[in-house]
Amino acid sequence: MNAANAVKYPELKIKLESYDSTLLDLTTKKIVEVVKGVDVKIKGPLPLPTKKEVITIIRSPHVDKASREQFEKNRHKRLMILVDVNQGAIDSLKRIKIPVGVTLRFSK
């Protein structure tokens, strides 16, 4: 094993968040393809509970408080765990183009 592909982390967790579930699924597929290309074991993508934000607004500007409208935002989450990550895998993960609506968080 050479120094460029030496094991850097025994485990690397990637947490993905997005308000658009289709964008999130496309991004997880991209990451899975890239990781399988560099021979790193992967656990997931594991779907985490969706957070639901509900906002209630009164429709009328003056009277009639009973008339209300509700809006909701759903935050979708996925967790991926990479095992025995080498420097080549980290470099290939850095090159992935992530869409604007997706947030990535890395942790050990």
From Swiss-Prot:
InterPro entries recorded: Ribosomal_uS10 (IPR001848), Ribosomal_uS10_CS (IPR018268), Ribosomal_uS10_dom (IPR027486), Ribosomal_uS10_dom_sf (IPR036838)
SMART domains: Ribosomal_S10
Superkingdom field: Bacteria
One BP annotation, GO: translation
Gene Ontology cellular component annotations, sorted alphabetically: ribonucleoprotein complex; ribosome
Pfam annotation, one family: Ribosomal_S10
ATP-binding among keywords: no
GO molecular function: structural constituent of ribosome; tRNA binding
Keyword terms, alphabetized: Ribonucleoprotein, Ribosomal protein
Signal peptide feature range: none
Family: Belongs to the universal ribosomal protein uS10 family.
Quaternary structure note: Part of the 30S ribosomal subunit.
Annotated function: Involved in the binding of tRNA to the ribosomes.
Name of protein: Small ribosomal subunit protein uS10
Organism of origin: Mycoplasma pneumoniae (strain ATCC 29342 / M129 / Subtype 1) (Mycoplasmoides pneumoniae)
Name of encoding gene: rpsJ
